[in-house]
UniProtKB/Swiss-Prot annotation:
Matches recorded under InterPro entries: Ribosomal_bS16, Ribosomal_bS16_CS, Ribosomal_bS16_dom_sf
GO biological process, one term: translation
Protein name per UniProt: Small ribosomal subunit protein bS16
Tree of life domain: Bacteria
Family, as annotated: Belongs to the bacterial ribosomal protein bS16 family.
Length: 88
């Protein structure tokens, strides 16, 4: 089972709010997920993201692949650098 760390859309029309979730890559965007690891609110200025660092690092260690957007969020939060330094 290939897992992805990706955004699941929530919120109202024209007011998106996203949950950062770990899901099987075959599931729908807003469908079933394995675990919720954070949130992302692009409506705030600047955009607000809250991630559970321990859970995120655990899933990255298990081989979950982040999408491009989530990878950028992880870099801004500093989690991606911690993961890469653990690998080295």
């Amino acid at each position: 089972m290939a897992t992805k760390i990706r955004l699941a859309r929530a919120g109202a029309k024209r007011k998106p709010f996203y949950q950062v979730v770990v899901a099987d890559e075959r599931c729908k965007r807003d469908g079933r997920f394995i675990e919720n690891v954070g949130t992302y609110d692009p409506n705030q200025n600047p955009a607000v993201f809250k991630l559970e660092e321990a859970k995120t690092l655990e899933w990255l260690g298990k081989g979950a692949q982040p999408t491009d957007t989530v990878k950028q969020i992880l870099k801004k939060a500093g989690i991606w650098e911690k993961f890469v330094s653990k690998l080295a």
